[in-house]
């Protein structure tokens, strides 16, 4: 058994050695302040980040990350690293988000930039390569953004991916592969995958409707027609309303003063509505006409949709109404297995967070109970003694 364990450990170590880690940040100490750059873009009041493990955690040191600290603020913070291209290999972007403030409206996503990023001028309109991560605003928006820049235009994924909306740490992973496929994982579990060309509007449609094709004039696409043999019954036509036969003229009605009395109108019980002949199958029905398609002359395949020619920066460029989100464990690599291995610790972190928060909640309940005024407790005791409960209804036995 020990030999098997050693082999597994050796294989994982070999995987880690062979993979390229282009960027990794775990915020172990205050050194982040010299590595990350705040934007000074004019006209925006940017919020500040603080290094903290938050109010509940698994490890007070290992769980430290950057926390948004000011409500109703834009945030713009970035870091550059050695540039690289993912040509011919996978691209993995991974990080954790902890909305411990129970966020109501705000972003939790990461942007990936090329080297043209001017860090001190970064803002919402700054071009980026990739935008990935959760975004929450009210009950209607709880989604994972996956946006790629292609030929100068940002393209949003056509699928809806739901993000986590609780108060614990969650791991978000984007994997882009050289075969133009992708995967999105949350907490190391695949939540979406597919083909880049199919799930984004990078390219024009392969096929278009033939502009020369026209539906034939004699094409009958009505599945049913009125029955030509059906005839309206002779007694069909009845008025919709009739005078109320039970109504009588009031005794004090004066025809000279009030005019000629007329009984009020009521719905006619014999009224059958507008007659229409019954429908029968159309013998000339040819089915719905399908517009024929042709190859789109504007379509050109691109085998390099996955490729980013240059990546050299990441940034947190977002808005939050209620601050308190903690970002941590940034990783950009070419090895999905190595990223998954690093992500396994997040499950243990969640367990520790839930345990501490549960203890905190219980302590808060005990504190509130202890701080209750004595007269409230006396009233509760009196209620218990007098049996002040809802009356029980008596029922006859069957």
From Swiss-Prot:
Q: Which Pfam families match?
A: Calreticulin
Q: Where is this chain compositionally biased, Basic and acidic residues type?
A: 207-251, 337-372
The UniProt entry annotates the motif Prevents secretion from ER at 395-398
Annotated region 3 X approximate repeats: the residues are 259-297
Residue numbers spanned by region C-domain: 309-398
Q: What GO molecular function annotation could you give as one example from this UniProt entry?
A: carbohydrate binding
Q: Which GO terms describe its cellular component?
A: endoplasmic reticulum lumen; endoplasmic reticulum membrane
Acidic residues bias spans: 373-387
The segment annotated P-domain runs over 198-308
Q: Where is the signal peptide?
A: 1-19
Top-rank taxon: Eukaryota
Q: Which residues bind an alpha-D-glucoside?
A: 109, 111, 128, 135, 317
Instruction: Give induction info.
Output: Induced by disturbances in intracellular calcium levels caused by the chelators BAPTA-AM and EDTA, the endoplasmic reticulum calcium-ATPase inhibitor thapsigargin and by calcium. Not induced by the endoplasmic reticulum stress-inducing drugs brefeldin A, DTT and tunicamycin, or by heat stress and hydrogen peroxide.
Tell me the ranges holding the sequence repeats.
191-202, 210-221, 227-238, 244-255, 259-269, 273-283, 287-297
**Keywords of this protein's UniProt record, alphabetized?**
Calcium, Chaperone, Disulfide bond, Endoplasmic reticulum, Lectin, Metal-binding, Repeat, Signal, Zinc
| Similarity remark | Belongs to the calreticulin family.
Cite the domain annotation text: Can be divided into a N-terminal globular domain, a proline-rich P-domain forming an elongated arm-like structure and a C-terminal acidic domain. The P-domain binds one molecule of calcium with high affinity, whereas the acidic C-domain binds multiple calcium ions with low affinity. The interaction with glycans occurs through a binding site in the globular lectin domain.
Protein's name according to its UniProt entry: Calreticulin
Q: Which organism is it from?
A: Bombyx mori
Q: What is the lineage of its organism?
A: Eukaryota, Metazoa, Ecdysozoa, Arthropoda, Hexapoda
């Amino acid at each position: 058994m020990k030999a098997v364990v050693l082999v597994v450990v050796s294989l994982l170590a070999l995987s880690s050695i062979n993979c390229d880690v282009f960027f990794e940040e775990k915020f172990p100490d205050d050194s982040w302040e010299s590595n990350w750059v705040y934007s000074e873009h004019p006209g925006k009041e940017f919020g500040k980040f603080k290094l903290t493990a938050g109010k509940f955690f698994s490890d007070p040191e290992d769980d430290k990350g950057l926390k948004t600290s000011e409500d109703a603020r834009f945030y713009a913070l970035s870091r550059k690293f050695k540039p690289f291209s993912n040509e011919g290999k996978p691209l993995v972007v991974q990080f954790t988000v902890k909305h411990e403030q129970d966020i109501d409206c705000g972003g939790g996503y990461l942007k990936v930039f090329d080297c043209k990023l001017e860090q001190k001028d970064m803002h919402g309109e700054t071009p980026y390569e990739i935008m990935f991560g959760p975004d929450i605003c009210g009950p209607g928006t709880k989604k994972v953004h996956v946006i790629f820049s292609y030929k100068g235009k940002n393209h949003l994924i056509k699928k809806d991916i739901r993000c986590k909306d609780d108060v614990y740490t969650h791991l978000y992973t984007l994997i882009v592969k050289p075969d133009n496929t992708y995967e999105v994982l949350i907490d190391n579990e695949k939540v979406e995958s597919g083909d880049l060309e199919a799930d984004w509007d990078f390219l024009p449609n392969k096929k278009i409707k033939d502009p020369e094709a026209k539906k034939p004039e004699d094409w009958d696409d009505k599945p049913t027609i009125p029955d030509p043999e059906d005839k309206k019954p002779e007694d069909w036509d009845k008025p919709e309303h009739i005078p109320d036969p039970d109504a009588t003229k009031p005794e004090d009605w004066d025809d000279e003063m009030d005019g000629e009395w007329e009984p009020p109108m009521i719905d006619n019980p014999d009224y059958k509505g507008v007659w229409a002949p019954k429908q029968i199958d159309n013998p000339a029905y040819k089915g719905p006409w399908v517009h024929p398609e042709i190859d789109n002359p504007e379509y050109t395949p691109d085998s390099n949709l996955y490729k980013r020619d240059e990546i050299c920066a990441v940034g947190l460029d977002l808005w939050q109404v209620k601050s308190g989100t903690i970002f941590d464990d940034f990783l950009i690599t070419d090895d999905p297995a190595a990223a998954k291995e690093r992500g396994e610790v997040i499950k243990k972190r969640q367990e520790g967070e839930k345990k501490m928060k549960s203890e905190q909640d219980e302590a808060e309940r005990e504190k509130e109970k202890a701080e209750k005024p004595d007269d409230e407790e006396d009233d509760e005791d009196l209620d218990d003694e007098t049996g002040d409960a809802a009356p029980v209804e008596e029922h006859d036995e069957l």
